[in-house]
Amino acid sequence: VILLLLIASIPSDAVQLKTKDDMPLASFHGNARRTLQMLSNKRICCYPNEWCCD
């Protein structure tokens, strides 16, 4: 049981701490995702009703 707890507590390569260089890239991806989602929502909304494209 102790061995299993030790193995579970060892950090893996997939889980790494974020550095200050990682933050702008994560922010960029979040902004890009929000922009694409907004554009796709406007296209669906505005196609039948052009007045909603403000």
From Swiss-Prot:
This protein's record includes keyword Secreted: yes
UniProt propeptide residues: 15-43
A GO cellular component entry from the record: extracellular region
Compartment list: Secreted
Annotated organism of origin: Conus victoriae
Sites bearing 4-carboxyglutamate, chain numbering: 50
Keywords: Bromination, Cleavage on pair of basic residues, Disulfide bond, Gamma-carboxyglutamic acid, Secreted, Signal, Toxin
Location (main, coarse): secreted
Family listed: Belongs to the conotoxin T superfamily.
Keyword Disulfide bond: yes
Tissue specificity remark: Expressed by the venom duct.
Post-translational modification: Contains 2 disulfide bonds that can be either 'C1-C3, C2-C4' or 'C1-C4, C2-C3', since these disulfide connectivities have been observed for conotoxins with cysteine framework V (for examples, see AC P0DQQ7 and AC P81755).
Signal peptide start and end residues: 1-14
InterPro entries with a match to the protein in the record: T-conotoxin
Swiss-Prot/TrEMBL domain comment: The cysteine framework is V (CC-CC).
GO molecular function annotation: toxin activity
Post-translational modification 6'-bromotryptophan, affected residues: 51
Lineage summary: Eukaryota, Metazoa, Spiralia, Lophotrochozoa, Mollusca
Name assigned to this protein: Conotoxin vc5c
